[in-house]
Amino acid sequence: MMATQTLSIDSYQDGQQMQVVTELKTEQDPNCSEPDAEGVSPPPVESQTPMDVDKQAIYRHPLFPLLALLFEKCEQSTQGSEGTTSASFDVDIENFVRKQEKEGKPFFCEDPETDNLMVKAIQVLRIHLLELEKVNELCKDFCSRYIACLKTKMNSETLLSGEPGSPYSPVQSQQIQSAITGTISPQGIVVPASALQQGNVAMATVAGGTVYQPVTVVTPQGQVVTQTLSPGTIRIQNSQLQLQLNQDLSILHQDDGSSKNKRGVLPKHATNVMRSWLFQHIGHPYPTEDEKKQIAAQTNLTLLQVNNWFINARRRILQPMLDSSCSETPKTKKKTAQNRPVQRFWPDSIASGVAQPPPSELTMSEGAVVTITTPVNMNVDSLQSLSSDGATLAVQQVMMAGQSEDESVDSTEEDAGALAPAHISGLVLENSDSLQ
């Protein structure tokens, strides 16, 4: 790559920009200023074409040095890795304006068309320079990411291959073992076996594995408890090491998958807080966002966990309660429908035309008073002639009437503290052929 060269406005002076202008009008040579003796005149000067006139107008324009500088910056941005920035061009513009003002030179010429052409050309190159700067930044970002990825991959390969610098290399093993030897535990002190034996066991690296120094565990009293490694060399193959590492990674992945599959159990404190809120607002068990945030702060849960718990609670706790209450409602209505006045067992003409004597009362074991009203043609003696089956049936009807009244009071007066005792007005028996 080409080295980045420093460009400035000073490198584009009037003298240098005139070098690119082709002078079509050649001056006469001093040696050939006089015609020869034969009177042959010099060849006539060729006339300038319109293109040549336009070129001269561009080269002689006051903004041409700035245009050339910008063009050079764009070329350098495409050739080298270190591209020029737009900020440096802004500085060059300031320097150019300051220099033109200092020297008293104009910024434009007498031709407005040429001035417009130069300004537009500078604007186009300026936009091109900005785009090149963006591309350069993207390239640098890509290179940095790619290099970081390569470094990570190379470090992982070095870790598995056991090359120098990896944790499984002999150098790293010596450092780890030296750190272990200085560790004191309640069971004993771990020291190299070479420190206890006359012959030292040297460490060596063989092809395909690493040889480790044997280690012996010694109690604080100086007694040898056990020798954790054999005095011989221990060789760990790289393939076995890589296989073991792969197995460990697979176990870790399985543990992660099993932990994800397990359903999370919320703390008991959190469920108690949410359950209490649910029953306090059982009429409208839908917490607002602020209430959810407050509950999440109290229970150390996330908003998602709180929201899911309330959704499940409305379906699993409140819905069964609502279903059970709906199933008991028909029974209540059925019992209420049974609460009707005692049906008369004789014609209305007899009941309205005959005066009734004072009733006779019988006391039951439950404390209910049963009043038996006898018509004119019946007396107490005729009541004694009732069969036992008829009397039992009459008492059962009285008890059922009392129960129906109690249940009707429960269904219609839910806010009452206690139920009023049922008063049974009387039991009217029909003087029919079946009871005689």
From Swiss-Prot:
Q: What is its main location?
A: nucleus
GO MF term (any one) = DNA-binding transcription factor activity, RNA polymerase II-specific
Q: Which residues carry this modification: Phosphoserine?
A: 33, 41
Any one biological process term the GO annotation gives: transcription by RNA polymerase II
What is known about what this protein does? Answer: Activates transcription in the presence of PBX1A and HOXA1.
Q: Which InterPro entries match?
A: HD, Homeodomain-like_sf, KN_HD, PKNOX/Meis_N, TALE_homeobox
Q: Entry's Pfam families?
A: Homeobox_KN, Meis_PKNOX_N
Signal peptide boundaries: none
Gene3D superfamilies, A to Z: Homeodomain-like (1.10.10.60)
The UniProt record lists the keyword Glycosyltransferase: no
Q: Localized where? A: Nucleus
Q: Give the gene symbol.
A: PKNOX1
The GO cellular component terms are: chromatin; cytoplasm; nucleus; transcription regulator complex
DNA-binding region ranges: 259-321
The molecule here is called Homeobox protein PKNOX1
Ranges where the MEIS N-terminal domain occurs: 80-163
The lineage's top-level taxon is Eukaryota
User: Compositional bias (Polar residues) at which positions?
Assistant: 1-20
The entry's note on the tissues where this protein occurs is: Ubiquitous. Isoform 2 is expressed in all examined tissues except in bone marrow.
What's the family? Answer: Belongs to the TALE/MEIS homeobox family.
What does the record note on quaternary structure?
A: Interacts with MN1.
Q: Which UniProt keywords apply?
A: Activator, DNA-binding, Homeobox, Nucleus, Phosphoprotein, Transcription, Transcription regulation
Q: Does the keyword DNA-binding apply?
A: yes
Which regions are flagged for Acidic residues bias? 404-416
